[in-house]
Amino acid sequence: MSLPATFDLTPEDAQLLLAANTHLGARNVQVHQEPYVFNARPDGVHVINVGKTWEKLVLAARIIAAIPNPEDVVAISSRTYGQRAVLKFAAHTGATPIAGRFTPGSFTNYITRSFKEPRLVIVTDPRSDAQAIKEASYVNIPVIALTDLDSPSEYVDVAIPCNNRGKHSIGLIWYLLAREVLRLRGALTDRTQPWSIMPDLYFYRNPEEIEQQTAEEAAQEAGEEEAKEEVTEEQTEAAEWAQENADNVEW
């Protein structure tokens, strides 16, 4: 699939994809994923063609941008590494996020409180989000999926070949997808200028690490305050001592 020149993969984006290990696939390869294989390493890990990944990502972005109401797009991730990325994608593009467990019947049972009638579904992993894909097939909703080389492709209309197990890879794909959607909608008019949002915002962060970092920062601030108080006390004592000596000299 040949893309217009404006959609070509830039060296900066290629470096991001490689740095996030998006090109590292699985050891096993499904038949439908064979066209996306670039090579195989000696340890058995298959390398994904980053050019194919970019082509499918742009195709998915064009499909998303063609839907008039952004809320009709549902972004799903039951995988932990993709939940933050899905929420950020929805915040930037206006899509409807489902982060966490997908409630069965959300697309088929209109009695449930979580019932939705989307026009497009995007999932992070066809295995983890199999229930959502299955229900989408029942009601003829097209599905875009982030697929690894060993991921099943049944009922998936557009597969974006990538490493859908790494937290950096998942976050970067959602980031690039959101950026391309905004560019196609006209929100980001200048393609030569980078997006003000950094990819790190889409990466998964461990809550325990965040709490530990917050505690360390609080301890550091407390230590700095104690040091300032000690310095202030020493300065006060020195000033009092100097005043006493001055009084004695005058006497």
Swiss-Prot record:
<dbReference type="GO" id="GO:0000028">
    <property type="term" value="P:ribosomal small subunit assembly"/>
</dbReference>
<keyword id="KW-0689">Ribosomal protein</keyword>
<protein>
    <recommendedName>
        <fullName>Small ribosomal subunit protein uS2</fullName>
    </recommendedName>
</protein>
<dbReference type="GO" id="GO:0022627">
    <property type="term" value="C:cytosolic small ribosomal subunit"/>
</dbReference>
<feature type="compositionally biased region" description="Acidic residues">
    <location>
        <begin position="218"/>
        <end position="237"/>
    </location>
</feature>
<dbReference type="InterPro" id="IPR005707">
    <property type="entry name" value="Ribosomal_uS2_euk/arc"/>
</dbReference>
<dbReference type="InterPro" id="IPR027498">
    <property type="entry name" value="Ribosomal_uS2_euk"/>
</dbReference>
<comment type="similarity">
    <text>Belongs to the universal ribosomal protein uS2 family.</text>
</comment>
<feature type="region of interest" description="Disordered">
    <location>
        <begin position="209"/>
        <end position="251"/>
    </location>
</feature>
<dbReference type="Pfam" id="PF00318">
    <property type="entry name" value="Ribosomal_S2"/>
</dbReference>
<feature type="compositionally biased region" description="Low complexity">
    <location>
        <begin position="238"/>
        <end position="251"/>
    </location>
</feature>
<keyword id="KW-0963">Cytoplasm</keyword>
<comment type="function">
    <text>Required for the assembly and/or stability of the 40S ribosomal subunit. Required for the processing of the 20S rRNA-precursor to mature 18S rRNA in a late step of the maturation of 40S ribosomal subunits.</text>
</comment>
<keyword id="KW-0687">Ribonucleoprotein</keyword>
<dbReference type="GO" id="GO:0003735">
    <property type="term" value="F:structural constituent of ribosome"/>
</dbReference>
<dbReference type="InterPro" id="IPR001865">
    <property type="entry name" value="Ribosomal_uS2"/>
</dbReference>
<dbReference type="GO" id="GO:0006412">
    <property type="term" value="P:translation"/>
</dbReference>
<feature type="modified residue" description="N-acetylserine">
    <location>
        <position position="2"/>
    </location>
</feature>
<dbReference type="InterPro" id="IPR023591">
    <property type="entry name" value="Ribosomal_uS2_flav_dom_sf"/>
</dbReference>
<dbReference type="InterPro" id="IPR018130">
    <property type="entry name" value="Ribosomal_uS2_CS"/>
</dbReference>
<keyword id="KW-0007">Acetylation</keyword>
<comment type="subunit">
    <text>Component of the small ribosomal subunit. Mature ribosomes consist of a small (40S) and a large (60S) subunit. The 40S subunit contains about 33 different proteins and 1 molecule of RNA (18S). The 60S subunit contains about 49 different proteins and 3 molecules of RNA (25S, 5.8S and 5S). Interacts with RPS21.</text>
</comment>
